[in-house]
Amino acid sequence: MKKVLFGLVLAAVALPLSAQQKPVYLDASKPIEERVEDALSRLTLEEKVKLTHAQSKFSSAGVPRLGIPDVWTDDGPHGIRPDVLWDEWEQAGCTNDSCVAFPALTCLAATWNPEMSLLYGQSIGEEARYRNKSVLLGPGVNIYRTPLNGRNFEYMGEDPYLAGKMVSPYIRGVQQNGVAACVKHFALNNHEVNRHTTNVIVDDRALYEIYLPAFKMAVQEGGAWSIMGAYNLYKGQHLCHNQYTLNDILKGEWGFDGVVISDWGGTHDTWQAITNGLDMEFGSWTNGLSNGASNAYDNYYLANPYLNLIREGKVGTTELDDKVR
């Protein structure tokens, strides 16, 4: 699915050249795997690293030299937010149209109607595509465990089976528009208090029977192209770069081959981000990394710190190529 998402990007940049003149990565007649590998071979080390982290609050850089566009993300699960300024939260004022404020996902789940969920996903996906967004930051399927969670309305209830069966058609509807659905927040993210520091303690039975089924169905039935990690910790390791949940379960047991992105400011360690399954690091200018920097995004864990480790020979490029691929 990571190749599918990248293939959509390649399709958007195909140049009006004859088949003989086209490089393989722009030749729509070639298999997507071949096109991706050709594009990968043309990227410099610096260009590859730039593809793994944010360049603004809601985008990551493309590669203009090869005609590869930026990736633009957008909130949220029940409506396309107005565009905001590059490094401020004020509205940019660059659009004068309106978007639909859809019912929250808790309302959608209450219909028990997968066909309605498909229509919902198709509709919000159309609006995301109209706004030239690559990734919709939703839907959310965290399980209700406390009524004090102020974000419960974003999710699909307390029943893992219902949430999974309702989220899958939503995902398919969004992605029919060529927009990636980003299912969040993986996983065990069930309240907002101390969300960056809470270390969740749960046994495997509860994990697999309550907290993971909706995500598993999102991947295996919905075909999600993207997953967002959660802020909290599990087994003492942040879930945006958690070996057990991302590599062992998501990519290993479930066979997910899409893109794992961090929640905004949810990355905390370069080594873990490299090795533990994270593909793209997102956040804002104010992640505590901006002191003295002309561009705070260069200080992200998967930015210059990652690039320097490669240049110093402390880490190879196998993981980098996988993230970019």
Identify the role of each PLM range.
Residues 1-22:
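Bacterial Sec-dependent N-terminal signal peptides
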Residues 20-325:
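Glycoside hydrolase catalytic-domain context in secreted enzymes
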